[in-house]
């Protein structure tokens, strides 16, 4: 997953593409390890999602369903990934949660 994911998405926005991004959680990891501003990057991602002309499929992991992590880095990651997922879901036309191969339509 490239760090400049929004630009990569928009590079394929021509109405004829189906684009699969797997996975946003790995992108969030790379942003944190690269000491990038995850909030600003998520802003750019949401703008790219709104501007994309085609069929865009985004995959992310849900990392907030377990116990509270015992270390600061893991808690920060959980929070960054959770905020990113919420913001992406807000601009997405459809949101599915998949567990054990079973889809649950959230939006």
State where each predicted segment sits.
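Conserved inter-motif catalytic segment of the P-loop NTP-binding fold
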Residues: 1-44
């Amino acid at each position: 997953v490239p760090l400049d994911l929004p630009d990569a998405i928009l590079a394929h926005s021509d109405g004829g593409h189906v684009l699969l991004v797997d996975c946003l959680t790995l992108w969030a990891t790379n942003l944190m390890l690269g000491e990038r501003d995850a909030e600003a990057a998520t802003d750019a991602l949401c703008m790219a999602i709104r501007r994309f002309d085609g069929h865009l499929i985004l995959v992310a992991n849900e990392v907030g369903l377990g116990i509270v992590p015992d270390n600061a880095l893991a808690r920060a990651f959980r929070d960054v990934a959770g905020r990113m997922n919420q913001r992406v879901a807000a601009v997405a036309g459809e949101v599915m949660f998949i567990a054990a191969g079973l889809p649950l339509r959230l939006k």
